[in-house]
Amino acid sequence: STRRETAMCDACVIESVKQRMVSRRGLLRAAAVGTAGIAAAGMGIVPPALAAGHGSVTDLTHELHEEFPTFFGQQQFFREQKFKYAEHKFNLFELRVNEHTGTHVDAPLHFSADGLSVAELPLDKLIVPLCVVDIREKAAADPDAQLTPDDIKAWIAANGDIPENACVAMLSGWSDHLGSDKFRNADTAGKMHFPGFHVEAAKFLIEDTRAAGIAVDTLSLDHGISPDFAAHYAWLPEGRWGLEAAANLDKLPAKGATLVLGAPKHRGGTGGPARVFALV
């Protein structure tokens, strides 16, 4: 009888400990969530609960590799394997890359004497509403086509005002040509032919909206044949950023998506390859 009572008491103790552990775990989880929320708020990061309305994620980043086409027509991404798994039991590559290679961000410093570096871009300007302006029809007819103020005004008429801190993206369909010479589309004289932003479109966004960034699915914010980088010089010195060689813009709605720009953070950088995606 005594043994049975002892065993029963032991079982009670074990069950009591289990219940306490469960309660403690719940408390710790709640504390962790609360602490994480406070930390996130302090860092300016949007808590997951605020993003619960998004149902899908679209990758807007092309895979970067040695043969990725570049504005200058020369290789800009290099890698050398320093450690191999077969020999060292881990793999490691050393990279050398031009900042403006692949899907990448242009910081204001890229086209100004003292603009913000890529490391200084404010977080609230990197998670923004995305407005996709579709110019595929005229880009198919003319590779030198430009996104104009009229294109933006037509978007506004159909979708409403450009939201504060938005990224206005040009969808020209040019990413379909990636992997062929038509992506650069250089003529016999070496001049490239692909769509981009008209300088007046950049000025319109500066003067009439509070957009934070512009994006293109080509190699440059300016169209390929531009002799003077007019859109770059109008846009970037105003403290705004640009995104070049974006992927999958055709998979997004004209409005309603949220762009997340995973910009690099190297000191004094004029830009850099970025991991970019959209929440829809």
Language model features: what each stretch is:
Residues 2-280:
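Active-/binding-site microenvironments in catalytic and ligand-binding cores
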